[in-house]
């Protein structure tokens, strides 16, 4: 196997220490480990004797695989397309040659015509008499599939050429249970389409990653994923009782059972954006409302922010007009970080750098929460307290301004009118936050609203040997 170090990984102390991964992990390397790291940096094949270290690098997100062709091809894949009141033909036409295609019509108002499928062995059109939701539709499709790999592709998605081949190589690792592509919004002339090209909740960006809770890539959307059938069956498949958030739930259950899940942005699937402001608001509200149901199944993992008290104190001091005190509070953890780092010439500098990065990220989380999940509290505080009003307004305005400026660097068709961007950003954030509060009240679960401290939740992934049936 060939792998590459994560872009954030840093070799220190003459190569004897490696920092990287999400969450951050420190590796102390002996001579053998240093030779393995040298081979990784040179792009060489990693010998079998080094696979224990390689597993640790992959499981912490410190390194990422560079798979070859792998044991599977497109004929080993059944594509399952759940449909409800949509035209699946653009999706089906973009799939190319695969083992089989199964369309599940989840009680569309106008039934999907049988002629949408290119009839070949294994192709099927299945129907639900009543609407049961996308998770149930995917389960129906899975029950009819016989191939070792399953691709779930929503009917509002159009895969780019070569998307499947870019994902299949990852399954040469028998512990990989799921791989997801980059899901980008289709560019269009409308304000919503332009906004979604920059801020789609399905677009996780251009940087690959391991997928696991409490990491940089905490989930992937089920709009398009390829799953090992044995892995899906080992956790009971998608939960049909969840109409939203079922993809997050599945990924977290797979990881909990020891399966590796990967995000591979070299594979691209395009997604049609919502056509109206009301539809966008309903979508974001639904996403927010699913957080409490996920908190019931995975307590502590959906907290809107993970914050240390010192970081909150530091940013509170800055907001109150005491920037020096706030900065000192923000850098205070450098003392404890220094003790945790191994003795090396760069220890002091790295401790300060890590403390500063942690403080900045805490500020980003606070700003996001104040305008998204905590906006009812922030709005109330701005009316009650004049002193709080100015920093809260700045907290709301600065991210919006930065977001709009970023649209200027994109293609011409993605650039937003500033007023349209502000309105859409407000609808996006307020709808999501309202959904979180509605779900928390309905489920009586405050975990989707309250922040937590690092380390308060332990998410353990069971070490796993490839199960029978995982191999080709």
Identify the residue ranges that each predicted region occupies.
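Conserved donor NDP-sugar-binding/catalytic core segment of glycosyltransferases
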Residues: 161-194, 272
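Active-site-adjacent helix/loop segment of glycosyltransferases
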Residues: 264-265, 270-329, 338-437, 451
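Glycine-rich, basic loop-to-helix element that forms the pyrophosphate-binding segment
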Residues: 127-145, 155, 209-218
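Acidic donor-binding loop at a coil-to-helix junction in glycosyltransferase catalytic cores
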Residues: 244-250, 283
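Short, flexible, basic/aromatic active-site loop/helix in glycosyltransferases
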Residues: 181, 196-217
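Acidic donor-binding/catalytic loop of UDP-sugar-dependent glycosyltransferases
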Residues: 89, 110-111, 157-170
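Short aromatic/hydrophobic "clamp" motif used to bind/position activated sugar donors
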Residues: 150
């Amino acid at each position: 196997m060939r792998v590459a170090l994560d872009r954030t990984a840093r070799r220190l102390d003459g190569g004897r220490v490696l920092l990287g991964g999400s969450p951050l992990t420190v590796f102390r390397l002996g001579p053998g480990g240093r030779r393995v790291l040298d081979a990784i940096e040179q792009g060489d094949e990693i010998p079998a004797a080094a696979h224990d270290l390689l597993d640790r690098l992959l499981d912490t997100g410190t390194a990422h695989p560079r798979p070859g062709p792998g044991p599977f091809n497109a004929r080993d894949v059944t594509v399952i397309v759940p449909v409800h009141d949509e035209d699946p033909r653009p999706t089906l036409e973009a799939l190319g040659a695969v083992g089989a295609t199964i369309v599940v019509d989840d009680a569309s108002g106008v039934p999907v015509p049988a002629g949408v499928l290119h009839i070949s062995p294994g192709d099927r059109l299945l129907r639900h008499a009543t609407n049961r939701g996308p998770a149930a539709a995917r389960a129906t499709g899975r029950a009819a599939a016989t191939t070792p790999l399953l691709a779930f592709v929503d009917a509002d998605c159009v895969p780019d050429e070569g998307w499947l081949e870019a994902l299949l190589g990852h399954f040469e690792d028998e512990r990989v249970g799921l791989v997801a592509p980059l899901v980008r919004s289709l560019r269009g002339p409308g304000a919503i389409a332009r906004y979604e090209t920059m801020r789609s909740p399905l677009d996780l960006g251009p940087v690959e990653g391991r997928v696991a809770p409490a990491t940089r890539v905490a989930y992937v959307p089920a709009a398009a994923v390829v799953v090992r059938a044995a892995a899906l069956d080992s956790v009971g498949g998608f939960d049909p009782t969840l109409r939203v958030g079922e993809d997050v739930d599945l990924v977290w259950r797979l990881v909990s059972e020891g399966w590796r899940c990967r995000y591979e942005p070299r594979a691209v699937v395009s997604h049609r954006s919502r056509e109206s402001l009301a539809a966008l608001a309903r979508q974001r509200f639904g996403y927010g409302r699913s957080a409490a149901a996920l908190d019931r199944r995975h307590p502590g993992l959906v907290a809107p922010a993970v914050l240390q008290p010192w970081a909150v104190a530091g940013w509170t001091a800055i907001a109150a007009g005491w920037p020096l005190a706030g900065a000192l509070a923000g850098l205070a953890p450098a003392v404890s970080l220094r003790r945790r780092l191994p003795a090396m010439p760069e220890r002091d500098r790295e401790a300060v750098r890590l403390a500063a990065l942690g403080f900045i990220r805490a500020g980003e989380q606070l700003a996001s929460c104040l305008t998204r999940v905590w906006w009812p509290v922030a709005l109330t505080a701005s009316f009650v307290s004049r002193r709080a009003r100015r920093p809260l307004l700045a907290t709301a305005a600065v991210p919006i301004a930065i977001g709009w400026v970023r649209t200027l660097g994109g293609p011409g068709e993605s650039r937003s009118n500033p007023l349209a961007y502000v309105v859409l950003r407000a609808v996006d954030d307020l709808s999501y936050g309202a959904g979180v509060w509605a779900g928390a009240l309905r489920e009586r679960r405050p975990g989707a609203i309250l922040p937590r401290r690092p380390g308060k939740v332990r998410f353990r992934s069971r070490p796993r040997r490839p199960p029978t049936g995982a191999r080709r």
